[in-house]
Amino acid sequence: MARMVRRNRKIVNYSEFGDFEDGDEDFACIAAPLTKKSRTQPKEPKKENKKKQKTQKEFTSSQKQSPIGRTSLDDSFCERDLNVTLALSIKEKSANILEVQNSKEQGQVLDDDIPRNGCRQWTAASKAFSHQKLLTIDSCDREHVTDSEPVTIPDEESEEDSDYREGNDEDCAMEKMKINGMKKKIKRQTRKEKKTPKSENNTTVMELKSEQTQKMMSTSSEPVGRPLYTSSPVTNKKPKWVPPGRACAVSFL
């Protein structure tokens, strides 16, 4: 272990400096000279000044660069208009959705409120209208006969009627039977009208054939010449048959 080294201390005699009466003057408050600064002043203001200078420099540099990257007034107005239109379109979509929902609900309520007792009146009017249509179609088909397909009446009215005829099953069945009967009649008439020209053609062909057969019969019924040799009554031999061509030749000779 190293031993502690004792330092030599000097002893000061204050009596050498003079009287102690003037000792208080040394501790008196004396104003510092103007040229020197006090050590107690804080150092923070320097930092603040530096920060201010930096901000000013940045601001000036941004002002210099701003004309290049600055947006024009027209562009800014366009952006505002776009934002406004987007907001309005979103609001309109929401309003349209609400209107559609309300209209659907109102339509369901109206359908429920329709009375079924008035179905008969509506069906009677539809009957009259369909009957008139059928009559006009019959007249047109009789006047203008063509080789086209038979006329078919659309079943839209019958389908619409069936939706409103749930309460009156008997009336609906009778009406359907009548409509089907009218359709069958129209189809039969068109088929008959198509068959009539074919029958006329057949009759003309038969007449031509009959005329030809009559001519053939008339030619075959011409008189045949007499035979050259006649058999005697004594003998029982049969006479020989001679064709008509030879007989004619012999007679000419």
Curated annotation (Swiss-Prot):
* Region of interest: Disordered: 33-74, 141-169, 184-244
* GO biological process: one example: positive regulation of reciprocal meiotic recombination
**Which stretches of sequence are listed as region Interaction with DNA?**
32-51, 190-241
Q: Which GO terms describe its cellular component?
A: chromosome; nucleus
* UniProt biased composition (Basic residues): 184-195
Q: What is its main location?
A: nucleus
Briefly state the protein's biological role. Structure-specific DNA-binding protein involved in DNA repair by promoting RAD51-mediated homologous recombination. Acts by stimulating D-Loop formation by RAD51: specifically enhances joint molecule formation through its structure-specific DNA interaction and its interaction with RAD51. Binds single-stranded DNA (ssDNA), double-stranded DNA (dsDNA) and secondary DNA structures, such as D-loop structures: has a strong preference for branched-DNA structures that are obligatory intermediates during joint molecule formation.
Subunit field text:
Monomer.
The protein here is known as RAD51-associated protein 1
What is the source species?
Gallus gallus
